[in-house]
Design a protein with these regions (language model features):
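N-terminal secretory signal peptides and thylakoid transit peptides that target proteins
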Residues: 1-18
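Short, acidic/polar
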Residues: 48-59, 103-112, 214-221, 262
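C-terminal segment of N-terminal export signals and the immediately downstream linker at the start
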Residues: 24-51, 58-59
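Conserved, mostly hydrophobic/aromatic
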Residues: 40, 60, 68, 85, ...
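Active-site acidic/histidine proton-transfer and metal-coordination neighborhood
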Residues: 14, 67, 91, 99-204, ...
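Acidic (Asp/Glu)-rich catalytic clusters
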Residues: 32-33, 57-62, 76-92, 107-118, ...
């Protein structure tokens, strides 16, 4: 999800499974470059799900996606979500929640996702150690205001959350944005997070697109932390004359048409511990399902 346009979502959203293959209509479907099912982060269809939850999931499956990652359940019950996922022929291995959501309703979130059969609970956006200091500030200001002390506090939070999620039979993880790669006093927050979090309690979902926008090197990260990263987000951005920044990312693009070079990233990822990957496109210049079909085909046909 984006560092800026997800504000509404962040404020309002309420044993790992490894799928080496998927079967649709008796046909074995594997996706390059990982021989893993093609996944979609459902934030991509956040405007469609509230209107027709079950129907949107069926459309997603018809595009060629086999797994989805939740970004809110839109007030549906466990039974309703499970029925919609099953009716679409999809798998739901992972769910996103902001730190604020997790802090407010952690036990309910654990219980809901455990009953649903989810394997990963992912923190989609970090917290601020002392939120009062930023009360009333814009989201843009908040994104720029994370200190090393905030990141170290988040590491402590993630370890505690990881213990509870692990005790419930699931895996806790963290999904990066852009600000984790802006050095502070010679320290890269992303590296500090991984240094201070317990590998048995906290896995990483590496958003390759946000790494690039934030000034990081996804290839180097995958090579440095091959055992810590179990999931990927795959996105692309349009070419633009304006320089990208932590708080001003370029517009989203369909995969294969923008600035991202996934060949070296996927080559490095093949040597890592990737269990799932999810396409995520957050803005569209064409009908969303048309764009997401192009994204799915890009992944299906990608060769490393």
């Amino acid at each position: 999800m984006p560092a800026l346009t997800r504000r509404e979502f962040l404020r309002s959203s309420s044993a790992a499974l490894v799928y080496g293959s998927a079967f649709v209509g008796g046909t074995r479907l594997l996706a390059s470059p990982f021989d893993l099912p093609i996944g979609l982060q459902l934030y991509s269809v956040r405007k469609l799900l509230p209107k027709d939850y079950a129907g949107t999931l069926k459309q997603v499956a018809a595009l060629g996606y086999q797994e989805v990652e939740a970004a809110g359940y839109f007030n549906h019950s466990v039974k309703e979500v499970r029925e919609a996922i099953d009716a679409a022929g999809l798998r739901l291995p992972s769910a996103h929640y902001s730190h604020d959501d997790l802090s407010r309703d952690f036990d309910k979130i654990i219980d809901f996702n455990k009953e649903l059969g989810v394997s990963y609970i992912i923190c989609s956006f970090p917290g601020i150690k002392n939120p009062a200091r930023l009360k009333g500030h814009s989201f843009k200001t908040i994104v720029q205001s994370f200190t090393i002390d905030d990141w170290r506090w988040n590491a402590e939070e993630f370890n505690k959350m990881g213990e509870k999620v692990k005790a419930a039979g699931m895996q806790f993880g963290y999904h990066n944005h852009t600000m984790e790669f802006r050095p502070q006093h010679g320290i890269v927050p992303f590296d500090e997070l991984l240094r201070l979090t317990d590998p048995s309690l906290v896995t990483i979902e590496l958003d390759c697109g946000w790494v690039m926008v934030g000034g990081g090197d996804a290839v180097a990260i995958l090579k440095r932390y091959p055992s810590r990263i179990s999931m990927l987000h795959v996105k692309d951005f349009k070419k633009t004359r304006k320089p990208a920044s932590v708080v001003a990312p370029p517009p989203a693009a369909v995969l294969g048409t923008g600035t991202a070079d996934y060949q070296p990233i996927f080559e490095a990822a093949r040597r890592a511990n990737i269990k799932h990957y999810f396409v995520e496109q957050e803005e569209f210049d064409r009908p969303p399902m048309e764009a997401l079909k192009i994204d799915a085909d890009y992944m299906k046909n990608f060769k490393t």
